[in-house]
Amino acid sequence: MFGVLNSSDHRAAVQQRNIPAFGRTSFELWTDNPTSNYRCETGGNGRDSGQNRVRRPMNAFMVWSRDQRRRVALENPQMKNSEISKQLGYQWKMLTEAEKWPFFEEAQRLQAMHREKYPDYKYRPRPKALPQKSDKLLPAASSSMLCRQVLVDEKWYPFTYRDSCSRAAHPRMEDQLSSSQPVNIANSLLQQEHHYCSTSLRDSPETLAMHLSADPPFYPK
């Protein structure tokens, strides 16, 4: 009889351990996680800085807005906290010096109490979180394609080029502009620019490096 009870207890214990996680409540899972308990006791980040951190004494505006913020939030529950702060800041600026003076006195009293309680206190602002840089390359924007106009025989012709192929095309463009055929220059320039753009993609890395190190773009006057 004693052996049967032990085996049944053993099976119950095994079944209890094999209960899937989705069959248990989130509170049970949270209490079984020692990391969660540690975060709860230390303030959320595994450190006790949340409980031991000394807050700054309130200034005059904070003393005044403490009750005003609560009142505005109750009157306008749909208003966001940022909008409430803007409204309170505007109302504070509209107050006269006589109306602000009682709050300055209260702030001075709170600061004196704070100095007595924390004589070694020094304000240390929290470092601002830096945005994480993405390692992924963004696609080329439409601004990488530049549009220029070429003046030929007192007429402006649109000329579109990309930075990757314009450096190789500009030396020959300069020679073309100095010739005496103004009518066909624009068409020949566009054809050469299309040819250099299409062939530069098939060039070797050495050839591309030579193109990039060529003379700067030529801009006709």
Curated annotation (Swiss-Prot):
Secretion signal, residue range per the UniProt entry: none
Cell compartment(s), UniProt: Nucleus speckle; Cytoplasm; Nucleus
Keyword field contains Cell inner membrane: no
SMART domains linked: HMG (SM00398)
Gene Ontology MF, one: RNA polymerase II cis-regulatory region sequence-specific DNA binding
DNA-binding region: 54-122
Known role: Transcriptional regulator that controls a genetic switch in male development. It is necessary and sufficient for initiating male sex determination by directing the development of supporting cell precursors (pre-Sertoli cells) as Sertoli rather than granulosa cells. Involved in different aspects of gene regulation including promoter activation or repression. Binds to the DNA consensus sequence 5'-[AT]AACAA[AT]-3'. SRY HMG box recognizes DNA by partial intercalation in the minor groove and promotes DNA bending. Also involved in pre-mRNA splicing.
SUBUNIT field: Interacts with CALM, EP300, HDAC3, KPNB1, ZNF208 isoform KRAB-O, PARP1, SLC9A3R2 and WT1. The interaction with EP300 modulates its DNA-binding activity. The interaction with KPNB1 is sensitive to dissociation by Ran in the GTP-bound form. Interaction with PARP1 impaired its DNA-binding activity.
Descriptive protein name: Sex-determining region Y protein
